[in-house]
């Protein structure tokens, strides 16, 4: 008789482990290929952009083949809104010695540009300096999320504000073409705000200006364009030179 010995436990992966590895590899491949490649939502948006704005199918397919869904962005935007704070609560957060020092340096370095913006748009230099300081600490924190990932995630996977973010995604593709920038390389906040003043794409296209007249609008690395854009934004939103900054509110009824 031939005795068959029981097989020793293999040090290799069992079937369950192999299956898990295969799933992981498939997920990794999907992430590398882009989570929105050939998705119905992306396909519909691509169709709209090609028909309405003359984009090439292959161009946008390549963009969305690289766009990645970011769960961390969905988690961040879904958090309950923080309690409303009064100015006395915000002041120590924003008015710090470090930010004041950076603001003074920024003002001194760009004094001529700030004066020109104030003259052309009627917005005081201190207002422009303060806005850029509050938004990004003078370019120190402009966001590290790829804008294409942020806006694709919020357009396609965040139904509560899909209409808004899909419009921003379309505006972003338009501005990337307009300014001849690679839509896969621009970074910003998790909501898609960009540059020193943290403009959303629609604000960029409506209010950003080429303030140094070099033929290109750059609010990411060019403080001159950022300064002019902030001033224009305020002007277009009704800023009145010499007008009231605050006024006493009156309440009628119960």
Language-model regions: role of each:
Residues 3-13, 17-19, 23-166, 171-187, ...:
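Cell-wall glycan-active module
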Residues 198:
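Functionally critical loop-and-helix segments that line ligand-binding/catalytic clefts
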């Amino acid at each position: 008789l031939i005795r068959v010995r029981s097989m020793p436990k293999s040090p290799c992966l069992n079937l369950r482990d192999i299956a898990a590895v295969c799933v992981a590899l498939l997920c990794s491949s999907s992430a590398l290929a882009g989570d929105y490649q050939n998705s119905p939502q992306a396909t519909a948006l691509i169709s709209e952009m090609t028909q309405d704005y003359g984009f090439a199918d292959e161009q946008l397919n390549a963009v969305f083949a690289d766009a990645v869904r970011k769960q961390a962005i969905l988690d961040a935007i879904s958090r309950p809104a923080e309690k409303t704070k009064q100015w006395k609560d915000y002041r120590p957060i924003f008015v710090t010695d470090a930010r004041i020092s950076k603001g003074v340096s920024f003002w001194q370095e760009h004094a001529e540009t700030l004066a020109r913006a104030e003259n052309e748009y009627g917005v005081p230099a201190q207002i422009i300096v303060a806005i850029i300081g509050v938004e990004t600490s003078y370019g120190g924190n402009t966001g590290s999320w790829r804008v294409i990932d942020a806006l694709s995630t919020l357009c396609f996977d965040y139904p509560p504000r899909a209409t808004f973010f899909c419009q921003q995604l379309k505006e972003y593709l338009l501005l990337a073409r307009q300014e001849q920038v690679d839509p896969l390389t621009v970074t910003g906040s998790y909501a898609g705000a960009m540059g020193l003043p943290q403009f959303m794409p629609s604000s960029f296209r409506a209010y950003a200006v080429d303030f140094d007249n070099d033929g290109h609008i750059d609010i990411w690395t060019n403080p001159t364009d950022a300064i002019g854009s902030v001033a224009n934004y305020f002007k277009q939103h009704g800023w009145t030179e010499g007008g009231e900054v605050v006024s006493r509110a009156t309440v009628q009824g119960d």
